[in-house]
From Swiss-Prot:
Location, primary (coarse class): nucleus
Top-level taxon of origin: Eukaryota
Compositional bias annotation for Acidic residues: 173-184, 954-967
Similarity comment text for this entry: Belongs to the DNA mismatch repair MutS family.
Entry binding sites for ATP: G639, P640, N641, A642, C643, G644, K645, S646
Comp. bias regions, Basic and acidic residues: 884-894, 1073-1084, 1254-1263
Function summary: Crucial component in meiotic recombination, functioning at some point after the initiation step of recombination. Plays a role in promoting the crossover outcome of meiotic recombination events. Required for formation of normal meiotic crossover, and crossover and chiasmata generated by artificially made DNA breaks. Together with him-14 and zhp-3 plays a role in the activation of DNA damage-dependent apoptosis at the DNA damage checkpoint in pachytene cells.
Name this protein carries in UniProt: MutS protein homolog 5
One of the record's GO molecular function terms: mismatched DNA binding
Length: 1369
């Protein structure tokens, strides 16, 4: 190979190695010794240079090139095997300056060639050079023995930077390492320039490789492929990977005979993990909150805390570094993990607290010595470095002496000789350096008694002041100067001895005196005396410093010889610090030791999240975990939103991680098999710079799990597939699970999957007996509020309670109501595109103007009726009572006026039913109220008002007014069916703006009296206060006839019911066609419809009476009078009218237009998620009184939602209304609080009439009734019913439960061994039993037929296959 390559370059005229960029120019590999460069040892003589010479088989070998990159304490690598043409990469791992993992990596790979960046850490280069390239020397000026290097960064010189003793020791260690290696040639080191390892160049090379098979790919596409296939966060791995590819391109390894366009063959790229390490990527670290974020504030106050911050109780710097290293590199070495667990157990015990506290105190004095050793090496160590060294070494010795006396001494093996040597170094350093004097002198000084010569010099220097004073006196006398003339002999370092004389002294007169310099006070001169002192003492201070420096250098040399021993003790101390931290955390939080086993199982009892338990405001609920037992390794978790699925799965991941770093786990008991990697799809790191969508990142993480997960891996997936279409997400998730489950229990990883795709069990192979289903228990409190218990239980649910979560988070009720209706439509099988849209109040004006067309279009009218029946709103408009007092007086005066004036007033009222203010409270409007148009106020005469009236389809035609009726019914031709639907839905947006204690004029019930029998019927008040007018007129002849048939009724009594709307009191618009046609159309439409209904009662309305004042009560009495005499009630109060007359439309039993003539005190009407309210219609108990009030029992009325309103058992024709006197008398007290569960109204029976509020099913009476009727059973939670129970209520506490049930949790039957589902699929799903009723058989048939049908990809919200299993068995 090398022959062809050299031959090619020589023919080009390039004398340098490698492919040149032109004649006479080399490449960046000029200074690199390429492999087998000795093939041309014979040179070019005899033409051998240009001939193909056979290679010596002994010299030939396949190359294994290892590329290394080390920076910021992280090591990345990649290597290429020429024999197999495989390229393998290793993600970044944490590495210290001992390079233990680097040694293990080289031993495992056994490379023949190592390439490294010569500009990286000097310790890294030194480690490689001393072992794999000891001959080559790189000097500090950037030159080598072969010439000048292209790299201008100063690099390390092993011969100059270290002492001879240390170099010899390293050479000996290298020889020992070589002896341990297998047979074969040693690896050769090539130091490449820094541009080979640049990140940008590596990315470009990877892009070129990714787009080699498709030239049409853009740069963005190539980058996305790289992002999805490689971990870009592993910077050192990417750098080494790119450098390796560039090196292969430069050397053309394996393709020397091919054209230049051919690159080195790479069959596959794989990721490898260093032995005994658990692979964990960056996304998993972030998802499980293992390490803190780089930008995270230190003061988190419990929010955003990481596991590392929780576990960091280390007292030393080396301990913190060791803890981070363990977190970066969890191990699979079971012996090492068991050893750590023993130490943690020892430090956790209370009886070892004294030893633990002592060790922690000493560890606080241990410092990192890497920088200290560098200062020692460069000779720039100062006093602070020596203090740090001596303090640390003494602390290390003390710690090891304590550990050797404990039962865990075997876990920290230290040779006695090594400990003795380090102890000697500490003693020697402490006894040589005088730290007290050094602080005064500002330099390192040596103690007395270390060196005799040094002691003599020090004594001489200390006695020098007395000597110089005596000499100064002698010179003063010799020079003839007067006493006290300031003559002095001075010693100046580096200058010597000088004589100081007064300035007026004549230096020129003395021939042996030389002037050196002068000051403003004296002259400094030299003479024979100073020269004699220089000869005798010399520069004594410098001699003293030099002597001390020589001793310190000797001490430094001896310390550096013991550097490795000291570093080893530092490593032991760091491990002790981390294990003490683990023990303190375990004792503080009550963690326990996990049992490490070889079998692939993950089991735990009372497991909880260690971080969430610290920040949660209430007690945390632990759960159990089981995976791998009996071959079940896939746990599919479903349940409501915000029930704790993600926290549960994170707890599992953290438990497994903690067990692989030797820590205790937050569980009572745990059994964990060793895992080789932890892969998650929980956390998505979004960035606008990477060009990838959120779903693409999710797919990237799942793809990583599919590529790397083995039978001993842990895979955690949280709601994968939610970032795209439901069908596509479900398909991908089902395919991923099928892929793993088909591999079998041995090769399938431990999978913990949470999803809201409730149809997932239908698309995975349950027959493999690998999957199990889990869910969380919830309670339904009063008012339909969901209470999460966060308790795991086996089972599978088909609802997520997303609407409840949305309500709790403040989503407006109209939005939730619309979502609930869409959900019910989808659950009923309606396609999403078939669900009609709804509009807001923005186009209300236009819709009101078009309402006349509705009554002309019968189909549109029927569709509007259906839309109204499905509405579930119960709020009231407080503003409707502002002008009610004036309207009442006006209506009373109009009651005795001629019929023509009454009709005109009623006509004016009907035009203003849906005013702007009445639209703010459209809760429980009657069907025709919702359809009547809203007209602007106009000051017109009665005839003009009548001309604009819309037809009344239920109006009883009077012979005397027939002509007038025909005159005002002018149908409009253009259709407005879409507007009808929008208008009906638009009313529901105003459900929550009404006051809690508002009054409704529709809550009044008027009992006819003899006085009123001959008078005109009362009118029903509109909701609006802005436009108020009398109600619709009825046939005077019919009303008079009915009144005459009830002569025994006493004076009018006003009945005020709890605040509850009776929807049966409708206005009566006229149809543009005949009455029979209308009746047949309504009957046919309602017989075909089967709306989903949930009976709801407004408990707040039952307390409205206590807020009423005498004035309001009088107004309510008038309203009751006005709301009573509608044509429907008139028909029912007549003896001549057939009791079945009002039911002639044949509406469904739960329709609000059908009279409820049945009362069964033992049956509580209800609804489920799949069926409407179906009361048993029977006329055996019907009575005339029941006929009058039966229409009050609607789906929104208390008389039908919980308890039907009974008729008079005596069958009397004219009921005595005096029975209500006591009730109305009690309601006068405005401050009296009415309990919703106590008697607040009379209901008619054989003895007396008592109106009673509905009793919840939790009461003893209801329980006994259900028991007698055989209806007591478990209840399933209907999400739609649950949400509808809260839509219109501002106060949750006062909201009744939609179905009157006790707060329940999910109930599951015991698994039946004979059940074919469990026998074949082994899926532990829950059993939701519906409340038993006469319609259960119908529902069972529906469920069976639904489950037998072929599944589709649309949203599947049906119950799972195990529903009602007890009945089948």
């Amino acid at each position: 190979m090398s022959t062809r390559w050299r031959y090619y370059n020589s023919k080009r005229g390039n004398g340098f190695r490698g492919r040149g960029r032109g004649r006479g120019r080399g490449t960046s590999l000029t200074a690199v010794a390429l492999p087998r460069d000795d093939n041309f040892h014979k040179g070019a003589q005899d033409g051998a240079y240009f001939k193909d010479m056979p290679m010596d088989p002994e010299q030939f070998r396949d190359e294994t090139v290892l590329s290394l990159s080390f920076a910021q304490g992280m090591l990345g690598a990649a290597y290429y095997e020429q024999s197999s043409q495989l390229l393998k990469i290793m993600n970044d791992i944490s590495e210290d300056l001992e390079f233990r993992f680097l040694k293990r990596l080289i031993d495992d790979v056994k490379p023949t060639l190592i390439i490294a960046n010569r500009s990286q850490d000097l310790e890294f280069i030194k480690f490689l050079t001393t072992r794999y390239d000891p001959q080559e020397k790189i000097y500090e000026d950037g030159t080598t023995e072969e010439g000048t290097s292209e790299d201008t960064v100063p690099t390390w010189d092993s011969s100059l930077a270290y002492s001879t003793d240390e170099t010899t020791a390293e050479k000996e260690e290298k020889e020992e390492d070589e002896d341990d290696d297998d047979e074969g040639l040693p690896a050769k080191l090539n130091k490449l320039p820094n541009n080979f390892f640049r990140m940008s160049r590596a990315i470009e090379r990877l892009k070129a490789m990714a787009g080699s098979h498709d030239s049409s790919m853009t740069e963005e596409d190539k980058y996305i492929i790289i992002k999805m296939r490689f971990d870009i966060e592993a910077v050192n791995m990417i750098r080494s990977f790119g450098a390796l590819l560039l090196f292969l391109d430069e050397t053309r390894m394996g393709v020397t005979d091919d054209p230049l366009s051919v690159t080195s063959p790479i069959k596959s790229i794989k990721t490898f993990t260093l032995g005994n390490l658990v692979e964990i990527d960056f996304n998993t670290i972030q998802a499980l909150d293992i390490l803190p974020k780089e930008t995270e504030n230190k003061k988190t106050f419990g929010q955003g805390r990481s596991l590392y911050q929780l576990m960091d109780k280390c007292r030393s710097t080396v301990g913190k570094k060791c803890l981070r290293k363990w977190f970066r590199n969890p191990t699979t070495d079971r012996d090492d993990l068991v050893s750590r667990q023993k130490c943690v157990h020892y430090f956790k015990q209370d009886w070892n607290a004294e030893v633990t506290a002592k060790l922690s105190s000493i560890l606080g004095r241990v410092k990192a010595l890497n920088s200290v050793f560098q200062k020692f090496q460069s000779g720039t160590a100062q006093l602070i470095h020596w203090e740090c060294f001596v303090s640390t070494v003494n602390a290390l010795v003390e710690i090891l002496n304590i550990i050797r006396q404990t039962p865990i001494s075997k876990e920290f093996p230290v040779e006695s000789d090594l400990l003795r040597e380090v102890s000697e170094i500490a003693v020697i350093a402490g006894s040589i350096i005088n730290f007290a004097e050094s602080k005064i002198q500002g330099r390192v000084t040596v103690m007395n008694g270390i060196d005799e010569e040094l002691d003599e010099i020090r004594d001489t220097y200390e006695n020098m002041p007395m000597v110089l004073t005596a000499i100064a006196k002698q010179e003063e006398a010799r020079l003839g100067l007067p006493p006290y003339s300031n003559v002095a002999c001075v010693y100046i370092p580096l200058v010597g001895f000088v004589l100081s004389v007064p300035r007026d002294y004549g230096v020129e007169s003395q021939p042996d005196m030389t002037l050196l310099y002068s000051t403003h006070e004296d002259l400094r001169v030299r003479n024979a005396t100073t020269s004699r002192l220089d000869d005798e003492f010399g520069d004594i201070l410098m001699r003293l410093i030099d002597s001390q420096t020589a001793i310190i250098l000797t001490l430094k040399t001896r310390v550096m010889k013991k550097k490795r021993s000291i570093i080893k003790l530092l490593s032991i101390a760091s491990r002790i610090d981390v294990l003490i931290s683990f023990g303190l955390i375990a004792a503080q939080n009550g963690w326990n030791c996990p049992a490490l086993v070889d079998e692939p199982v993950i089991e735990a009892v009372e497991l909880y999240h260690p971080i969430s338990v610290l920040v949660v405001k209430k007690s945390f609920v632990p759960n159990q975990v089981s995976s791998g037992r009996d071959g079940i390794k896939a746990s599919i978790i479903t349940g409501p939103n915000a029930c704790g699925k993600s926290v549960y799965m994170k707890s599992i991941g953290i438990m497994v991680f903690l067990s692989h770093i030797g820590s205790f786990v937050p569980a009572r008991h745990a059994k964990i098999g060793i895992v080789d990697r932890i892969v998650t799809r929980m956390f998505t790191v979004d960035s606008v710079l990477d060009g990838m969508s959120t779903f693409a990142k999710d797919v990237e993480q799942v793809a990583l799990a599919l590529r790397k997960a083995t039978g001993n891996s842990l895979v955690i997936i949280d709601e994968f597939g939610k970032g795209t279409m439901t069908e596509v997400g479900l398909s991908l998730l089902a395919s991923v699970m099928t892929y793993w489950m088909n591999r079998g229990a041995d090769r399938c990883p431990h999978i913990f999957l949470s999803s809201h795709f409730h149809a997932l069990p239908n698309y995975i192979p349950l027959e493999t007996n690998i999957a199990t289903f889990l869910t969380f228990t919830v309670l339904r409190e009063a008012g339909g509020k969901i209470k999460y218990l966060f308790r795991m239980t086996p089972g599978l649910v088909d609802c997520s309670f997303a609407l409840s979560v949305a309500k709790e988070e403040g989503i407006p009720p109209p939005v939730i109501g619309r979502a609930c209706r869409i959900y019910k439509a989808l659950k009923a099988g309606t396609l999403l595109k078939e669900i009609k849209a709804e509009v807001s109040n923005d186009n209300e004006k236009q819709l009101v103007e078009d309402m006349d067309v509705v009554l002309a279009d019968e189909d549109g009218f029927m569709a509007a009726v259906e839309s109204f029946v499905k509405r579930k709103k119960t709020s009231f408009c407080e503003s409707s009572m502002r002008n009610v007092s004036e309207e009442i007086e006006k209506e009373r005066s109009e009651a005795s006026t001629p019929a023509s004036k009454s009709r005109s007033t009623i006509t004016a009222r009907s035009n203003s039913v849906l005013s702007s203010r009445s639209m703010a409270s459209v809760d429980q409007l009657s069907v025709l109220d919702a359809l009547l148009p809203k007209k602007k106020k106009k000051k017109v005469t009665g005839s003009s008002m009548e001309s604009s009236m819309s037809p009344d389809p239920f109006q009883e035609e009077d012979e005397g007014t027939e002509g007038e009726e025909d005159q005002i019914s002018a149908p409009v031709s253009r259709p407005t069916l879409p507007s009808v639907q929008k208008y009906a839905s638009e009313e529901e947006k105003q459900q929550s703006i009404n006051s809690r204690h508002s009054f409704s004029t529709r809550t009044a019930i008027h009992i006819p009296t003899p006085i009123q029998m001959g008078e005109a019927g009362g009118v029903k008040r509109p909701r609006s206060t802005s436009t108020s007018s009398p109600g619709p007129s009825a046939s005077k002849s019919v009303r008079t006839e009915v009144f005459k048939k009830t002569p025994n009724v006493k004076e009018s009594q006003v009945l005020e019911t709890p605040k509850q709307l009776s929807i049966s009191s409708f206005l009566e618009p006229k149809f543009p066609s005949s009455e029979k046609d209308v009746i047949s159309r309504v009957s046919e439409r309602y017989l075909q419809s089967d709306p989903f209904k949930t009976p709801i009662s407004d408990r707040r309305s039952q307390q409205s009476s206590r807020h009423s004042t005498p004035k309001n009560r009088s107004m309510n009495q008038s309203l009751i009078q006005s709301a009573r005499d509608t044509p429907h009630e008139t028909i029912r109060s007549s003896n001549e009218v057939n009791p079945e007359f009002f039911n002639i439309f044949n509406f469904p039993d739960d329709s609000i237009l059908k009279s409820q003539d049945t009362y069964d005190p033992n049956v509580t009407p209800r609804s489920s998620s799949r069926r409407e309210l179906r009361p048993d219609v029977s006329h055996s108990q019907n009575s005339q009184f029941g006929e009058v009030f039966s229409e009050l029992g609607t789906q929104f009325s208390i008389f039908n939602s919980q308890q039907s309103f009974p008729g008079n058992s005596m069958g009397t024709t004219n009921p005595d209304c005096s029975i209500f006197d006591d009730f109305f008398a009690n309601s006068q007290d405005g401050e009296k609080k009415i309990d919703s569960t106590k008697t607040s109204m009379p209901i008619v029976n054989s003895d007396n009439f008592i109106f009673k509020t509905p009793e919840p099913r939790s009461s003893e009476k209801q329980r006994s009734l259900l028991k007698n009727k055989g209806q007591a059973s478990n209840s399933s939670i209907s999400p739609s019913s649950l949400i509808l129970g809260q839509l219109a209520f501002g106060d949750v506490d006062q909201t009744p439960r939609p179905r009157g049930d006790n707060p329940i949790e999910f109930q599951y039957d015991v698994v039946d061994d004979d059940d074919p589902i469990f026998e074949e699929k082994n899926c532990s799903a829950p059993v939701f039993e519906f409340l038993k009723s006469n319609d259960d058989e119908e529902d069972d048939e529906f469920l069976k037929s639904f489950l037998e049908t072929e599944g589709s990809l649309h949203i599947d919200t049906s119950a799972d296959e195990t529903i009602d299993r007890s009945k089948r068995s």
